[in-house]
């Protein structure tokens, strides 16, 4: 089988499983081919060095990356067609300390191809109702917990005739109806700069990929205070931690109270059918402001309900009882 056919087959199989990433990773004198599905990374295959080298070179060639460079970091991208659908692939390569190259391929899906299943749709509705108030809605949860997918689906359901602008690093989902901007530090386009540009475009809704620093936090707060609906994510262990994180980034209690409409916490939890569902919990700012420690009671009740419905095992519920 030709190398092109091997790569095509591998990528198409990854897309069938809705994998987010495909990895070529050196291990001894072999390469591991791995795929990431939500929170789980599994070994797809083991291949020899020469076969891996040929497959990686083919990928790099069609992504317009330098074949001769195997140690320094490189990035590339390409469109990929499978069936009637088009996908966007983002490639990243780098060599390890022995000079063996690794390659990661991120698969960017269209919003129409990404579907989120929830344990409790009432929580989704709660956050949707919060969105009518405008202001800042912050999602928290570990990397790979489906936050961006949920945000995109929420916004897509409510904005049939509104102007939506996204600012991300990098773009994770393709949606042609949104104006999507990507952070580019080399070009002097960081989150803060793009939010300022975005305000001049006067969108109805902002999606800011992540608040990572004080300047981005301040810019997102200003956008929310100026009458926009702003969705974003923050790294925090629980919903109360979101408020603490904003304070750590220099946002005053007064501005948080004025701008923060709601907070959501989400995890993707394995189900008994071998798939995953999102456990989502939403809170208005007033529910959280006086909490010193987050009360996981409602979350744990949701897990108990899922166990009774035989959607998750008791062992899985115990593993996720504190988020």
How does the language model describe each region?
Residues 1-323:
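Short, flexible helix-loop junctions that flank or precede catalytic/ligand sites
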